């Protein structure tokens, strides 16, 4: 969820906020200032990022209802999960989003709010048909992911199958070399792999790019967890990957126990792994 990196047809868009940008209204000065801040937050270090998104959340919440607030909350809703914003900030964003949707239903924004509710565990008081449909779609996606198996090769040619990893805790991470939030979380994945591999953690990082693109990227950065290639996007489709990064944790019994629809910090990954009994 998120300012995730989305891929449509043959064109790469490095932000799911772009659909809102295409219909962005002319902003008054206050809204222009908020819009400018949104354009800067991806470049901030984590500690500054957390403070900035908390401040922006309160500013957006206080805006009067109208097209400007609708556009800004749409953009912000797709950025605020790109790190550890904290539950209070996420709750403010969700409440502002629900207020906007009461006035002006929007299928895309309802989908964003549903993902906030499901995967960031915020409380949402909204009962529009579109929001209920978005939650139902997430339920269907999760059922499909739980039933999914796959076999893919890593960069050395070794094949990995999900069903053969029972007894291990498996963290599947969908990513790409061109995706900034994906690149930002990779050092944390490496640290987790080194720390918990002896305890049975397997990390499978899956890219839809060709091996000729992925291999030099990984070699240069010296990541050692398994990196798999899915250039036909078959496994991406099985997991309903509409934006990256996305991460899924399966426990030792093969049950899907945690999901993330955007970039996670090391602390957030640790919380996901605890749900599979790894700590």
Residue positions per predicted region:
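Bacterial N-terminal signal peptides that target proteins for export
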Residues: 1-10
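Alpha-helical, heptad-rich or low-complexity scaffold/stalk segments
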Residues: 27-112
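N-proximal helix/coil linker or "cap" segments that precede and/or mark the start of modular domains
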Residues: 106-149, 163-166
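A short beta-strand-turn-helix
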Residues: 151-170, 196
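Conserved redox-active cysteine motifs that mediate thiol-disulfide chemistry
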Residues: 166, 174-191
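Short pre-active-site segment immediately N-terminal to redox-active cysteine/selenocysteine motifs
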Residues: 168-170, 174-178, 210, 243, ...
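Structural microenvironment flanking redox-active thiols in thiol-disulfide oxidoreductases
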Residues: 183-221, 231-238
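Thiol/disulfide oxidoreductase modules built on the thioredoxin-like
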Residues: 216-224, 229-276
